[in-house]
């Protein structure tokens, strides 16, 4: 993981107040917040919805249920990592299409533009959520600054 990827974690990209009934509503809310900040192209919303439909990103890890939606860099204006801790869990289809729906308590939207960066980040995130203490620390965060600090410490 490059230091540049860790620098994509910013308090302005951490959301605790997003309410959504499903992944599509979550993407609408993210677009409303990220587009004015200059992170997304007009194609992002349709692209992330289509990618999620074809390649679901819900993960039922031993310590938490999460989702890691992302899309191709061509749909981004600039790189980012957005973190959403929704008011109530959001249902995502399971990665690989096998198993029950995932009730994601945390959604990490990757907007990485570096070649191979998304795969590397997915591996790092899996390491966090396979570890009970790290996962508990991340899930216990209640401020954007705390969330950035927790993730930054594990991803560096």
For each feature predicted by the language model, list its residue ranges:
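Cytosolic covalent-transfer regions centered on His/Cys nucleophiles
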Residues: 1-156
